[in-house]
Amino acid sequence: MIGRERMTVVSQRMIAERTYELTLSGQLVAQMNEPGQFVHIKVAEAADPLLRRPLSLCQIDHKQGQCIIIYRQEGKGTALLTQKQPGDRVDVLGPLGHGFPLDAAPAGGRALLVGGGIGVPPLYELAKQLANRGVNVVSVLGFATKAAVFYEAEFAAFGETYIATDDGSYGMAGRVTDVIEQQGLSFDVLYACGPKPMLKALDERFRGRPVYLSLEERMGCGVGACFACVCHVPGSETAYKKVCSDGPVFRAGEVVL
């Protein structure tokens, strides 16, 4: 069920270059269950910026009534969000969308988690929940450069973890797809979130396998009303799906990337 609440900022810190970890508390956390879902945050009390910012859930802690969101400062909206201090209130709408299907990974099976840049955060809660279900988790995380790397140790706590950087300044040089091939990583199910070229490469490479992709799209309303985030369905010029309400997670081949 979608709710709305002025959640309280518990803490905020920079964890990598232009990347922030924001912890919020509130009753809305009780409704957050699916890894891969997101929230829509109003970053300022004023009307400018008008639109909310869609930010994925990184961690859900029902006992503490807290959730963690990791985001990257890109423009005016996220710059305003970086100024939030403990005790401040933030207008939050959510949880939104459909997350990663946990049942696709059998207990004792092997799940490969592939993240690129700011697509890494939602995979953390996924890794945690899969590990709790007895799934063997392997993570491949890609970043532009060493300064952008975050949560390596956190993912490593759940299983084998590989880091790739575009410039080779940390971990393995190259793309996440290079790491998968070079390391010969096998899987029963693959979950991924990141830039569209990365998702497209995974879609093409592993078509026909159990692969689930979380799309990152600009959106207006977050609830399927404004049609700002639609993507086409293969084989049709008129059919489409909405990333915010039908997704953001889709099975590989379900939508055109």
Swiss-Prot record:
Gene this chain is encoded by: pyrK
UniProt-listed PANTHER family: DIHYDROOROTATE DEHYDROGENASE B (NAD(+)), ELECTRON TRANSFER SUBUNIT, DIHYDROOROTATE DEHYDROGENASE B (NAD(+)), ELECTRON TRANSFER SUBUNIT-RELATED
Give the lineage: Bacteria, Bacillati, Bacillota, Bacilli, Bacillales
| Family that this chain belongs to | Belongs to the PyrK family.
Name the chain's protein.
Dihydroorotate dehydrogenase B (NAD(+)), electron transfer subunit
Q: What are the alphabetically sorted keywords of the record?
A: 2Fe-2S, Electron transport, FAD, Flavoprotein, Iron, Iron-sulfur, Metal-binding, Pyrimidine biosynthesis, Transport
Cofactor binding notes = Binds 1 [2Fe-2S] cluster per subunit. Binds 1 FAD per subunit.
Q: PROSITE patterns recorded for this chain?
A: FAD_FR (PS51384)
Looking up Pfam families in the UniProt record yields:
DHODB_Fe-S_bind, FAD_binding_6, NAD_binding_1
Could you say which residues bind FAD here?
A: R53, P54, L55, S56, I70, Y71, R72, G77, T78
Q: Which GO terms describe its biological process?
A: 'de novo' UMP biosynthetic process
Superkingdom of the organism of origin: Bacteria
Q: How does it assemble?
A: Heterotetramer of 2 PyrK and 2 PyrD type B subunits.
Which residue ranges run through the membrane?
A: none
Q: Which residues form the FAD-binding FR-type domain?
A: 2-102
Function field: Responsible for channeling the electrons from the oxidation of dihydroorotate from the FMN redox center in the PyrD type B subunit to the ultimate electron acceptor NAD(+).
Asked if the Swiss-Prot or TrEMBL record annotates the protein with the keyword DNA repair, the reply is: no
Cofactor requirements of the protein = [2Fe-2S] cluster; FAD
